[in-house]
Amino acid sequence: MIKTLIAADRSERERFRIPRSVQQSIPIQKIYRDGIWQTGGKFSRTWRFADINYALASHEDQRDMFTAYCGALNSLPTDATTKITINNRRLNGADFQRSVLMRERGDSLDSYRREYNRVLTDKAAESNDLIQDKYITVSVARKNMDEARTFFHRVDADLSKNFGRLESGAKALDNQDRLRIFHDFFRPGEEEHFRFDLSDAMKKGHDFRDYICPDGLCFKADHFEMGGKVGRVLFLRDYASYIKDEMISKLSDFPQNLMLSIDILPIPTDEAIREVQSRILGIEADIARWQQRQNSRNNFTASIPYELEQLRTETKEFLDDLSTRDQRMIFANVTIVHMADTLEQLNTDTETLQAIGLEQACQFSVLRYQQEDGLNTALPYGLRRIKTTRTLTTESTAVLMPFRVQEIQDAGGIYYGVNAVSKNLLICNRKKLLNPHGFVLGVSGSGKSFSMKEAITFIALSTNDDIIMIDAEREYGELTRALQGAVLEISPSSPHHINPLDINRGYGAGENPVAMKSELMMSICEQQMGVGQLGAFHKSIIDRCTANIYHDFIKSGGEGRIPTLPDWRNEVKRQPEREAQELALASELFVEGSLNMFAHETNFDIDNRIVCFDLYEMGEQLKPTALNVVLETIQNRVAANRLAGRYTWVFVDEVYLFFKYYYSAQFLYKCWKRFRKYAAAMTAATQNIEECLRSETARLMLANSEFLILLNQAATDRAELAKLLHISETQMSHVTNVEAGHGLMRIGSSIIPFVNEFPRDGTLYRLMTTTPGDK
């Protein structure tokens, strides 16, 4: 018998006591402030790890993930038991209403909120409505807490490193998070009522188990009753000789409250090799005895029985795995606890789960008269009360793959559709990303503008954030007005004027605001004179004159009159240098000539919460200047919002226009870098992807964006994007000849296929669609 297994079984032994209350049936003796618990004679700690896109990866990527997961299993401590738990829980109505649905505010936009909430509710109803959490619980026998704490510090570093290689990560849970797991399991439907503060509980003399225990717990022969629900624990009795890596994901897809646990006990390699060699000697002895019996019967040509030959071959292969293929011997068992409202439903669910197992040639059986031990094994206490272990190698354990597909369901996020694999809602909070800026890319008709408008609508209806749009094709005006925003038409014939020299409080954020305005004037002048025509003398004059016209304004503490372009040109004309006269002549067209739309004081209220800059009628001559001036105006607004504590969303449609001109591309790139520090997120969209990819600035912005929506792509663009963004061929199939609203999202390092189909029978769809026949 293997000593490690004997020691592990011994550590699980505990004197039997009849529980006198529900609290006493929960096998936790002590909890410590750092999240370590004492259960029986063992200490345990739990980590949460994230799902990864295993099911969506190419065969080569899956092999790499499988190898990395094998490495993680090989790194598990041999003197401890590791439990991998997949926790399926249904999202209850109260949670859904609080975390996803929009609250009405008693204004004229409530009708839109009600319509959007109907869409979200319908989409949630179409999904399996599951939230899936994944945990690792490590339990170890130690003499005291200090030894246990030292052990878990080492395990924490190993798990973080090995699961980090999988891009999953492992985060240790504190008492609040660990107790919440059990509270939500024992008291389904009361998730929002959980509150626990260790210091407060100690002060009041409360038992921590009071906060998580069910109202009642009664164990029967083949099921248990718990607080008005019934449950049952199953265990994996018989393994197939070959198991597909999708079995665990199929079981965990079951649309009911369920916990699936895999207990793993690695054996030290030297001990495992000795055990297997001993088994081989035993088999060889059996074969020798069989041959002696045959020889005694004068049967010298008989072949060794197939069973013995097969057993010898498999055992030698197992030894070869241990000694040459970096495999570990692992004892493992699988348990499932599932819940239902009635016994009839429970029996039906049990049959369904057993059928899923039989599809993989695996037999799940009910634990009879062991439901309590089974429950304590399946839940992430760190206990292993069921002894139905199976001897596996690292690879055969890794086939019980806990990974499937990543879910994005951030609190306070924006709805972007549903996960194409799991059908769960995709809700992303871009404010939590390292860089909240993003791109929406797709050919004409792929749903690019609709996606932008949908995000704008969601933000407008569910938050107090400010929204600013740059609209080159006059597609956002109707939606802006419906959301009570302001549409500002920027053209030579428009009554609206923008003063590019406006400065708001907070402009510059630590930088020299006059120097920034000087850079703006240099870009405007060079666009009029031609790229490369602005020399060092010109730049010095521009910088000097810009500083001069702001002198009185700065001296007054920002309370005086803000200068305008005519003030700047007059200052230039006063300079004695010949280059000053060249600048004055070059600026005449847009200061005093027919294109003088920016030579006035700003004459509209830009402080509306939602603002759309309409550039549709802007001619080619002034378009580069207009793009820079609008960005400068937005930068002013973003700076003011930052001081006021307001978040700003900036949406730029047809962003390729910026990349056509050197200075506007550079200005956009500066805003892209600067706005993150200003509490602002930019979103740029374009259908002219090939043209954007010719710009090094655009490529740099794309590669450094944490958020991307890729819709249907042209063949030439797919190859370039796959190379630039490191997206596999399998993943790119989700943007190849797909319908509008279908595609890929890249959120941080996660790549998720999505479907975003909005109902066409509502007012919101008509406001957001760009299809003429759907208006």
Identify the residue ranges that each predicted region occupies:
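Conserved lysine of the Walker
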Residues: K448
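Post-Walker A helix-loop "phosphate-sensing" segment adjacent to the P-loop in P-loop NTPases
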Residues: F458-I468
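Hydrophobic positions on the alpha1 helix immediately C-terminal to the Walker A/P-loop
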Residues: S451
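Extended, folded cores of ATP/NTP-driven motor/assembly subunits in large transport
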Residues: M1-F403
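Hydrophobic anchor at the beta1->P-loop junction of P-loop NTPases
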Residues: V440
